[in-house]
Amino acid sequence: MINKRLNNHIRGHRIISVMVLCLFGFCLMQAMQAPKKHARKRPHGDRVYLLHADELYYDMFGNNPDAQILKGKVSFLHQGSHLTCDSAYFYQASNSVKAFGHVHYRQGDTLSLTCDRAEYDGQMQMMRARKNVVLHHRRQTLRTDSLDFDRLYNMANFFDGGTLIDGKDKLVADWGEYHTETREAKFVYNVKLRSGKDVVTTDTLYYDVRKSKAHMVGPSKIVSGASVVKTEDGYYDTKTDRAQLYGRSTVIDKDKTLTGDTLYYVKDGESTGYGNVVYVDKKSKNSLTCNYLRYNEKTGNGFATRNPVAIDYSQKDTLWVHSDTMRINTFHINTDSVYRKVHAYPKVRAYRLDMQAICDSLVFNSQDSCMTMYKDPIVWNGNRQLLGEKILVFMNDSTIRFAHVIGQALSVEQMPDSVHFNQISSSEMKSYFEKGEIKQGESIGNVQTIY
């Protein structure tokens, strides 16, 4: 009885031990078989099948004793893709092919590749094409002398110079890659994109074939007629001629320059600038700084806000105008001559060497160098102060020429003792200046004086 119980006890322990060992072995096998998340293994491809060859033989004593030597209308099939050539070495053991002469590779209805010679690895699903390589994918054509096509990742790489043609867009680079599934390309070193008459040069460019949109990285330039765009981080849409520029970019159009932290540039249309925007017109000799600007290159009209400052240096003395908002309108007198009107509002501040002014709103006309101020304007000239409902100031090359005060005009002149003031008030007042000083004054309507 005791022996029987002892045997049952031992047998129970054996069963438990076997179960533990089985469970441990199962866990160990699972751990060994668990795939690595960071590595994507290439599957073993199906066999490469020889469909046809006019001649087939072996050369056991030659350079390729393991190869079937094929000649004449050679044709292979591998996982739905076809490879044809004039002659080939077929390595059946390694599932690979070396093809020569009029090599033509076809994959489905959208991709074909031609070259002078190629190596195809069925295990790695890799095609290495050399000499006069032409890859056609949908409406795109890639030309190069050295190209590797990875079927598993749908990636074509060239590394000895290549050209991608996409409709009117033509991209040239020393090195590049093209993804046939996403239809995105990357080009590096001496990159040049031609789109119609526009030319983009850069060292690194990402190109989205579906959107015809290029992303330039590093020092880049877009030349479009007389316009030149410089950027180090920009997106360019070849269909719409629109560019999004970041990282302190510049647009140059003949004598005009637009610079900003962020620019949205539209060829022959309205462009927008954000952050430290600087606009310079060298021909008209004026400039504008602000933190937000809309400017139409075709019409010459613009809108500026966020601390705008307009600077006119067309005369010997420079005029500075500051306000919350500014509007710029350009007018063409004839083909070669233009003038501008600057509307500034509110909280206007203006400064020249011989004149300072404040008002609620101001209009400056570059044609007659007239500055018209509205709503509580005040003008200072030396020791004289002019006030009124509206003030017009006309300027010469370097000084004030004429001032016209309309409505509740008041002139205050500080005397040499800095204590007393001469004052004249009237409905209208005209002041004529010479060398920055009042030479003659006229007060019209309800004149009152205090001396």
Over which residues does each language-model region extend?
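N-terminal amphipathic/hydrophobic interface segments
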Residues: 31-451
